[in-house]
Amino acid sequence: MAVNNSDYLNVIERKIIDELRIFFNTHHSSANNDVVKVYGQFPEPEELKFPSVVIEQVGSGFEQKMMGEKVTFGGTTYTGELYGVAFVINILIDKDTEYNIGTSPQGTTNAKYKQRRLLNWMMLNIANTITSIDWATAVSSVPAGLSYNPRYDASVEVVESHLRAWRDVGYLPAFQWYGATAEFSLIFKNYR
């Protein structure tokens, strides 16, 4: 836990982005190194690569304000409150993108998913990755080229988190893109 950490929101956002980058870039060994792009905001159109995951912070604020703002967590008294933050997670896949998932459920080795099948696979694995984030444990191995910063580990005490159902799942014919959107929110202890 980090007291007087005025950077909680950036720490949380970076941790989500890095955990997704680590998952997608290490899944099935080096076959997928740098295949899936994970962005912290929508990139400029000319910089957009596929497949991509775009994490957008859409809101934050006090979840529960304490009387007098003095709170006791674990026997120690601090100034603070419970604070919430919300993100929208977007998946974008163009019609030509493929991703090597390894061995498919049908037994195919080096199976390459694309279009709707890739979208379904990414929705499930993003959900699994995000809900499995251990906010208190440092990541032990990081692929080269990722921006992961171990100082972000163990600096946020998450009270609860919620990943809501994927929506707007489908195909956009004008761009020939597949996509889906989900909302993720979490509540953490904001010590000051």
Where are these predicted regions, by residue range?
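Short acidic low-complexity segments
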Residues: 37-49
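A short, hydrophobic beta-strand-centered structural micro-motif
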Residues: 48-63
